[in-house]
Curated annotation (Swiss-Prot):
A GO CC term attached to the entry: nucleus
One GO biological process term: negative regulation of protein serine/threonine kinase activity
Keywords: Cell cycle, Nucleus, Protein kinase inhibitor, Stress response
Quaternary organization: Interacts with CDKA-1 and CYCD5-3.
Source organism per UniProt: Oryza sativa subsp. japonica
Protein name: Cyclin-dependent protein kinase inhibitor EL2
Compartments reported by the entry: Nucleus
Expression induction or repression: By cold, drought, propionic acid, chitin oligosaccharide elicitor and flagellin of P.avenae.
Keyword Nucleus on entry: yes
Region described as Disordered: spans on this chain: 1-22
Predominant cellular place of this UniProt entry's protein: nucleus
Role description: Probable cyclin-dependent protein kinase (CDK) inhibitor that functions as a repressor of mitosis in the endoreduplication cell cycle. May coordinate biotic and abiotic stress perception and cell cycle progression. Inhibits CDKs activity in vitro.
Gene coding for it: EL2
GO MF annotations, alphabetized: cyclin-dependent protein serine/threonine kinase inhibitor activity
Length: 106
């Protein structure tokens, strides 16, 4: 069931401002018809700066100055024998035991 040729009418041409401007005698701004609007400045005046890594936190070593530490803490003085009692040094017998357990390279 097709339409008979006598009832067929072609569709009218699509309206275009440029076509209308060509047939009109008035001057139409050529930038306003069928164009995507663009900003006046096309390129940035200056480039943005490159991204930078954040700076690492500065390490601050606490320096011990007895003159500044008055009232903040106490300095402890120990004799060598007291220090050895707190932190026992490795004796020669322990060193020999460690050396005998090491595998030998042959």
């Amino acid at each position: 069931m097709s339409a008979s040729p006598e009832f067929y009418r072609p569709s009218p041409p699509a309206f275009s401002p440029s076509c209308a401007a060509g047939t009109s005698t008035t001057e139409v701004d050529e930038y306003s018809c069928c164009r995507t609007p663009t900003p006046g400045i096309r390129e940035p005046a200056t480039c943005p700066p490159a991204p930078r890594k954040p700076r690492p936190v500065a390490c601050r070593k606490l320096l011990f100055d007895p003159a500044q530490q008055q009232g903040k803490g106490k300095a402890i003085s120990l004799r060598l024998d007291e220090l050895e009692r707190l932190f026992r040094p490795i004796t020669n017998n322990a060193n020999l035991h460690l050396q005998t357990n090491k595998p030998t390279h042959t």
